[in-house]
């Protein structure tokens, strides 16, 4: 995978990714645009036989924490384009190929505005019907998509896949098991911010700096679940050099004050939340879904047998997700 750029001219690392633009098929168009003074890197996916004089429904796709547009976000953007949608998958500000210093800053306000930035770009396209724009967020991108949709009503239909409540986990720990160390970790974050003033950037992350053999052994030592699967996906099978699984330690200051569940009642758009029935992150989707009291059109859809990360790549689960998204966006856009 070190030579992934040679394998795919667009740097895409997901299965069955576009390798060239062919007439009569979905095409990919790398684009850049400015958001809050930063150049954002995005991939636009155009449906087969795209005609710029026609009007299309569109979907913005937000990538997981620690990920990039060339991974699962690109997979689902391509799948939705195959269904006839114009789609966009953009790298978050400070992450991937998008600008921003320090690298890998992970502020919720930025991630939320990144989604609005994708909507901005789609709205400027003459071929997009502005009344038919939806959003799909995956993992952390799912949490930020629900947060964005609470107030950005240009989003007409909201979908999440394996939603991850970044603020809750950074604050309480995974499965809410680190509540007793909240203050200690806040002090650690404050100290990291002080170090940033001196030019030293401190990072947190789940992907250790190891070669393939070492990483495989480390992965095999972990219990089944999100982090073991995450190393397989991000560190081995679908790795990308800009998807490090890391974020600045100083980001904790902002992350720990954020919670997806806050103001979920402001979502009045159609809402679809998809998760694997065996995902150890399922509690986050269920809790957020329960608080989405402002919409009468909502559904929690479980992919039987799937774990969190398996919804990113396992063909049988991806197919079920795409079929559900086909129905949801077809009915609501």
Predicted regions mapped to residue ranges:
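Conserved alpha/beta-hydrolase
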Residues: 79-99
